[in-house]
Design a protein with these regions (language model features):
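Conserved P-loop NTPase motor core
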Residues: 1-407, 412, 417-424
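Generic leucine side-chain signal with a strong bias for well-ordered alpha-helical environments
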Residues: 316, 670-673
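Extended, charged helical/alpha-beta scaffold domains that provide interaction surfaces
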Residues: 173-181, 187-195, 396-397, 404, ...
Length: 673
């Protein structure tokens, strides 16, 4: 078993067992850490052969859009977040319906509407109006917000507006001990250690007036989609996979097989009841809870966020109905609360966190009262989450019942066409406060959920298309890195790097299409001596200019560069020590350039959508641009490795552990040049 507290040695020992129990997060982070170590003996994982994933839909679908990230601190200031938060508080939200087109978003079009910004709650967009753009320009004393140098300001003001208008305390996050903690939208649990990316977390910290932590720099990252697809074989189990059958097959190549229940299901799933207003709905729910409580039947009430659970709790307290609340604020008490949820007279209010897979035992005499009663206060975007709530009752053949209570003011109904449902209300002339159970409305709710599920699947699929590009590059880098880590002699690789650097410099300056007398010898000298520290300037002989033989020129410069490197090697008595230095410097250079490349690819991804305006596929454009950037990165790794090795200074015989220190000395020397 691997725990969060397990040491490196304990992890290695556990992974070497035939069967290892580990959480998906620990496993993923161990993989990333293995690809950051400098010495082979620090590795913990074996090859990825076979995995069995518990609650497989939670891991491979719900968490598919959240990458695992190992990060370090960046040097970016946090002041801009505070300034944008101050400005966002002064800005007025427009009264428009917020239906901003995707084309407007891509073009960053200034929408002519009232107010300073518009919000599209369906797609979670915020957009400045013409008034808003002017307000930002005046506040920051800039002429044009759309200028490239002002992109950071534009990005941060949008983040601040999103934080205030789309991210809600006690729903999307909680504030605890002056820290903003993410609430998992699917489980309702706090996600310690996780942070919203792209500066959104900092914008929320500024909004909540807690310390704004510096933006982090990504050192290594991978999505669960790509990580688990690296296993030779994979399988999983869950009670709610059938609605996502297509995604399991398309993304993971996994078939979904429904296994019959151990005992027949006796739970009765009632049709939804729908009310006109949220107030009417909550009053009806409280009445139903009170009725069940009076006869002793236990009730589990599922809410979709903390606010809703606390509002319902307040109403029950006024009716003097004893109950327990289980949400992200009280998650420490989860096991105790869930254990008692099936007892006589128990009333439990829970966000989506009422323990996936938790077996709620029925107390004595409860089966005769009808078993555990499930009440859903709102439909979730995903039918799976609703099914999980229903599945808390009627386990192992126990009796039970479930029912959802909805209102036209619920988010799902409000954002996906409550006008159509309202027309049904008006046609049937339903009196105020009275519920309706109608097939048309139930079908509408299911269609809305299917539509959202389809949208979310498309988003995850699109994410995977982009991430495949990153994944191919990551696999190449990690494979090369492992070669170095395995102790392979890198000397020949280093010598080839020197030759390639010389060759690239000569090709850039001495083109066969240009007359030899026009070759810029000063530029050639600058480029080559920036890499190889020749004492004398690099010049061309009259004969080389006359013959214009680029191949011969490269050969001369290569030979001189290799002679200089051989002299550098003689400064270190032990050849094995030099091989170790080459290995460590190459590893550290790969790591540094790779982390910069991750940031560059992220920036490319942010702006790639604009290319679709030219009738070009943004994913294809991303692949081509990413390929060019990857080639630039490999050239930069080669160049910096050679620079460092030529300039390394060894003042005494060093042991293996001191190699990284030597590398730092070399790096400092280089930065001072």
């Amino acid at each position: 078993i691997i725990l969060n507290s397990s040491t490196t040695d304990e992890r290695r020992e556990a992974y070497n067992c035939d069967i290892t129990y580990v959480t998906n997060n620990e496993l993923g982070f161990d993989y990333l850490r293995d690809n950051m170590v400098i010495y082979k003996e620090k590795l913990v994982l074996r090859d990825l052969h076979y995995c069995v994933i518990d609650e497989v839909d939670s891991v491979l679908i719900d968490e598919a859009r959240t990458p695992l990230i190992i990060s370090g601190q960046s040097g970016k200031s946090t002041e801009l977040y505070k300034m944008c938060d101050y400005l966002a508080r002064q800005m007025k939200r427009g009264e428009g319906d917020g239906e901003i087109s995707k084309m407007d978003m891509l073009m960053k079009t200034e929408v002519e509407e009232d107010g300073d910004f518009l919000v599209n709650e369906k797609d979670k967009y915020v957009m400045l109006t013409a008034n808003g753009v002017k307000m930002v320009e005046q506040f920051f004393h800039i002429d044009n917000l759309s200028d490239p140098e002002n992109m950071e300001i534009q990005h941060n003001i949008i983040l601040a507006l999103r934080a205030h208008n789309l991210m809600f305390r006690d729903r999307d996050y909680v504030v605890k001990d002056d820290e903003v903690l993410i609430v998992d939208e699917f489980t309702g649990r706090i996600m310690p250690g996780r942070r919203f990316s792209d500066g959104l977390h900092q914008a929320i910290e500024a909004k909540e007036n807690v310390k704004v932590k510096r933006e982090s720099k990504t050192l290594a990252t991978i999505t669960f989609q790509n990580f688990f697809n690296m296993f030779d074989k994979k399988a999983g189990m869950t009670g709610t996979a059938q609605t996502e059958e297509e995604e399991f097959r398309e993304i993971y190549g996994m078939d979904v097989v429904v296994i019959p229940t151990n005992r027949p299901i006796q739970r009765i799933d009632q049709p939804d009841s729908i009310f006109k207003t949220k107030k009417e709905k909550l009053n009806a729910i409280v009445e139903q809870i009170n009725e069940s409580y009076r006869k002793g039947q236990p009730v589990l009430v599922g809410t979709i966020n903390i606010d809703a659970s606390e509002e319902l709790s307040h109403m029950l307290s006024k009716r003097k109905v004893p109950h327990k609340v289980l949400n992200a604020k009280f998650h420490e008490l989860e096991a105790e609360i869930v254990a008692d949820a099936g007892q006589k007279n128990a009333v439990t209010i829970a966000t989506n966190m009422a323990g996936r897979g938790t077996d709620i035992k029925l107390g004595e005499g409860v089966a005769e009262l009808g078993g555990l009663r499930i009440i859903g206060t709102e439909r979730h975007e995903s039918r799976r989450i609703d099914n999980q709530l229903r599945g808390r009752s009627g386990r192992q053949g126990d009796p039970g019942e479930s029912k959802f209570y909805l209102s036209l003011e619920d988010d799902l109904m409000r954002l996906f066409g409550s006008e159509r449902v309202m027309s049904v209300y008006d046609t049937l002339k339903i009196p105020e406060g009275e519920e309706i159970e109608h097939k048309t409305i139930s079908n509408f709710v299911e269609k809305a959920q299917k539509k959202i599920e389809g949208n979310n699947f498309a988003i995850r699929k699109n994410l995977l298309e982009y991430d495949r590009v990153n994944n191919e590059q990551r696999e190449i880098i990690y494979k090369e890195r492992r070669r170095v880590l395995d102790g392979e002699n890198m000397h020949e690789v280093i010598l080839k790097m020197i030759k390639d650097d010389i060759s690239a410099a000569v090709d850039q300056v001495c083109s066969s299409e240009t007359a030899p007398e026009d070759w810029n010898q000063v530029e050639l000298d600058d480029m080559i001596r920036n890499i190889v520290p020749f004492e004398e300037p690099v010049t061309l002989t009259e004969e080389e200019i006359r013959k214009a033989d680029i191949k011969e020129l490269k050969e001369r410069l290569n030979n001189e560069a290799l002679e200089l490197y051989a002299e550098k090697e003689k400064e270190i008595d032990d050849p094995d020590q030099m091989r170790e230095i080459e290995r460590v410097i190459l590893l550290k250079t790969i790591d540094r350039k790779w982390t910069d490349h991750i940031d560059d690819m992220d920036n490319l991804r942010q702006g790639i959508g604009l290319r679709s305006l030219g009738q070009r596929d943004p994913v294809v454009e991303y692949k081509f641009a990413g390929y060019d950037m990857f080639n630039d990165m490999t050239a930069a790794i080669r160049e910096e490795t050679v620079k460092l090795l030529y300039r390394i200074k060894v003042e005494q015989k060093i042991e293996r552990e001191a190699v990284s220190y030597t590398h730092l000395r070399a790096h400092e020397t280089l930065s001072d040049l």
